Amino acid sequence: GTGKPLREFLFVDDLAYAIKFIVENNIESDLINVGSNEEVSILELAKEIKSVVGFEGELIFDSTKPDGNPRKLLDSTLLNSKGWNAKTNLSDGLEITYSWFKENI
């Protein structure tokens, strides 16, 4: 693809805190989206990963391949209106995850 599609990523600890928040606050709904409200392009994600891991090579995208859905972003309005928001941005989440992998894998 081109790297242009927009996506949303959520750090796993933020998901765990969201579940705890939902249970402790007795939030009831048929559907509760848990999102970061931070959308980034696949290109931005690749650049961020490249920076975190110290990769010095070139990022190559193949525009002959499909991009898929141009935008995937959750509507987290319900949970945000109750006072919960993700605390870990993408950059910090990648740093934490990469550090964990280096120490444990």
Language model features: what each stretch is:
Residues G1-I105:
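C-terminal substrate-binding subdomain of Rossmann-fold SDR/epimerase-dehydratase oxidoreductases
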